[in-house]
């Protein structure tokens, strides 16, 4: 859960350039379209970046095909996606900015303790965006909203790593 909480990064709207209500709506609706695919999201990230998989002790060094259909994998994927869903749901409302900042700050602190690098957060971002592009209605407006949300998230997380 810890690493994919990174996904949560994607949704902050609580920094210098918070998401507008329209941008938050685009992020939320596109996320809603895929958030039930927890296992597929995590598997896509691991397939694209095995170094991320190796940050998870219970999955490190194992063949993705052999772990993808296990209960442990599904449970972990659900934890990650649930965290991301919480952050995404809070985005776009100025009164939630402090809550989002707290969640994302803790994410950065927790990942620093695990030795996760800014580069690995970047890999996660790339894999997540690729998954979204392949599985939701994706246009320039959706891409811009996700990029802004992810930029905002990284502005909080990266300095804490």
From Swiss-Prot:
Domain Globin intervals: 18-161
InterPro entries reported for this sequence: Erythrocruorin, Globin, Globin-like_sf, Globin/Proto, Mb-like_M
Disulphide bond pairs: none
Annotated positions binding heme b: 76, 111
Pfam families: Globin
Gene3D superfamilies assigned to the protein according to its UniProt record, in alphabetical order: Globins
Domain of life, per lineage: Eukaryota
Keywords: Heme, Iron, Metal-binding, Oxygen transport, Signal, Transport
GO MF entries: heme binding; metal ion binding; oxygen binding; oxygen carrier activity
Signal sequence bounds: 1-16
Record-stated family: Belongs to the globin family.
Subunit structure: Homodimer.
PANTHER family registered for this protein in UniProt: GLOBIN-LIKE PROTEIN (PTHR47217:SF1)
Protein name: Globin CTT-VIIB-8
Species this protein is from: Chironomus thummi piger (Midge)
């Amino acid at each position: 859960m810890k690493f994919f909480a990174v996904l949560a990064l994607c949704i902050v709207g609580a920094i210098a350039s918070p998401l507008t209500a329209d941008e938050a709506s685009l992020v939320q609706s596109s996320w809603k379209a895929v958030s039930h695919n927890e296992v597929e999201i995590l598997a896509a990230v691991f397939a694209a970046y095995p170094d991320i998989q190796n940050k998870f002790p219970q999955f490190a060094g194992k063949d993705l095909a052999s772990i993808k259909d296990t209960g442990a994998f599904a449970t972990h994927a659900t934890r990650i996606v649930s965290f991301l869903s919480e952050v995404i749901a809070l985005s776009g409302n100025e009164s939630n900015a402090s809550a989002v900042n707290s969640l994302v700050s803790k994410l950065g602190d927790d990942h620093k303790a695990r030795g996760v690098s800014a580069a690995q957060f970047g890999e996660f971002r790339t894999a997540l965006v690729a998954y979204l592009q392949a599985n939701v209605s994706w246009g320039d407006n959706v891409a811009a909203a996700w990029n802004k949300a992810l930029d905002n998230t990284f502005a909080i997380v990266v300095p804490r790593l």
